[in-house]
Amino acid sequence: MKKKSDGQCAFLNLRLLIALLVFLSGVALAMFADARPRSGKPSSNVAQKQTVTAGVQPPNQAFWAQTNGPQGGDGIALATSPSGHIFVGTQGGGVFRSTDNGETWTGINNGLADTNVRALVINNAGHIFAGTWSSGVFRSTDNGDSWTAVNNGLDSLSVRSLVINSSGDIFAGTFYGGVYRSVDNGDNWTLLNTGAAGPYVPALAINASGDVFAATWDVKFCTGIFRSTDNGDSWTEINNGLTNLGILSFAINENGDVFAGADVDGLCGNGRVFRSTNNGDSWELVQSGLSTGNGINALLATSGGAIFAGSYGDGVFRSTDNGDNWTPVNTGLTEQRVISFTVNQNGDIFAGTYVGGGVFRSSDNGNTWVERNNGLVATDVRAIAIKSDNTIFAGTYGTGMDRSSDTGQSWEQINNGLFAHFIRSLASAPNGHIFAGADFVDGLGGVFRSTDNGQSWTDVNQGVIEFDVRALAINSNGHIFAGTYVGGTIGGVWRSTDDGESWTHVNNGDNCGLIWSLAIDSQGHIFAGTAGCGDGVYRSTDNGDTWQLANTGLTSTNVAALAVSNNGHIFAGTRSLIGKGGGIFRSSDDGETWTEEDNGLTALDVNALSINSVGHIFAGTDGGAFQSKNDGANWLDVSSGLIPPRGPIDALAIDSEGFAFAGTAGGGVFRSVQPTVRSTPAPRPRPTPRPRPTPPL
């Protein structure tokens, strides 16, 4: 064989080196391609196997995030700052701020330990003071961005009213603790009850001279109005002419005339609005044109001379002749339980409403009103149902039904035909129909059905079940069971086998009638949880025809929630009664016996239970959310991200992707940041590098 020359060898070595580099580059490219973030689109030639695992929460990440609704809330207190910003204190949702005249709202609760806000007042420096249900007074010196408790000397921490005089002295009216004063911007408080009668002070007012007016109540009777002319050091009763001592609100006009709004429960007298033109020495009834059915929770005197009265159920009334005559001004006011007012420098009037109605604004002296709740998420959500396509239905207590088709990013109110707005239960049927159970309020209640994804609703109460419907459950055959909360044999469980068209009372064996929860297992056995009668749980194995008590070991019998896991175990969430009981119980034998499973459960008043596809149990309590990954044996607090962190949860549901949704008392709906069950692709096999031809030698 002919020996190759040195040049030929060099050329051969170069070609071999090139071939090797090409081969290695192919391997490297294949490895790099496998290491890049995957787009989620499956390869055309590789089968994508899915494995279901428990969701893992990244460290230091909150478990929950608030969704964008449902919007609204109880506008308990309103105030306007010197800069024109509007603040609203809500029941359960804390404080919200609007910097654009109510067009949008932002929650500002950093440091606000109690989000049940009953009073707001702002001084000339822009410092904001919030009176809370059970945690006293909080102060913000940075426009609400942060809050600090200022309760030194304030022995009664349930604050219902706040006012500030021209010197900056702050007065706080408390719930059965009397009146307190702070002369140092809230740093310290002094009790001021000399001469005052009733210790419950729902309203305070200060005139231009610094005289303080206090509405007072006692345990057994109403005590009317007291006045202090020495900055609160002493008080004098001024009830001459008051035919109703149950005062709830005040307003003082530019002339110094004092207006007082009263309750109308009949226990404290008669009359709704009173006027004094002599600083409270005497009062006269001024209610011509006012409706007689509801009390006056709010009063407002504007710089233009108009007086506005907010009633609990009849909306807003306006007087342009100093109270002599009143006219209803409710155009656009869709919620007419009005409980607070404020007015800005431009004369725009804001009205806070109850039962979730939120805030309304009028820019034409009350002639028309527009709802302004964008970003105001402080609703009370008592029920959640999720359809198979992950459409979420949220039943609120006061504003009816909301729906979200994008995991809570946006919500729309869907109340067409839904005349009862105090929703307590929801269920989705196999045929896609949605059923809503409502409390009986204002003459409306019972069961409603939607056959078009919530676009419209129909009252389906044939068979007389217009009661408080606290629970709904639907079996695999589409039979619907409604648990009503009505004592005695008239209440209990009702069944419909025709999509709600008609109902049959199926209470054989159950004499309690106070049904709070329902669940159905894979065998079709029905479990009914009762409350208030000591019966605990009933079970039916024949589609509701007969019932038997199933309570062995169930030491707490107020059963607010029931859930069944994939392994057939039944869980009962209970609530305490007079400080006793509460907690979670498990049955692994179809309800025959129960075992208490509370290890790690630090809040024992349980309102809701939900179980994901891998058997992890979630419990909603008065003290936040808990999770068990071992069949209830141990519980972990998963309340982070809630507002407040351990606030009440009244409803729970989990969608098909494993995301948990929580209905809260004052914060709308929250969603778990991560799915509680995570579907992840199995590792893809690394592509085998395609052989490349060896260059010819």
What do these predicted ranges mean?
Residues R36-R38, S43-P59, T676-P696:
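Ser/Thr-rich, Proline-interspersed low-complexity disordered segments
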Residues N68-A79, G111-V121, G153-V163, G195-L204, ...:
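Short coil-to-beta transitions that initiate beta-strands within beta-rich domains
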Residues G69, N344, F350, V355-G357, ...:
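Blade-level signature of beta-propeller repeat domains, shared across WD40, Kelch, NHL, RCC1
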Residues T80-S83, I122-A125, I164-S167, I206-S209, ...:
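Residue-level detector of Asp-centered blade-edge/turn motifs that repeat once per structural unit
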Residues H85-F87, F96, I128-F129, F138, ...:
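Conserved beta-propeller blade signature
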Residues G94-R97, S135-R139, G178-R181, T223-R227, ...:
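A short loop-to-beta-strand structural motif that recurs across blades of beta-propeller domains
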Residues T99-E103, T141-D145, V183-D187, T229-D233, ...:
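Short loop/turn segments that connect beta-strands within beta-propeller blades
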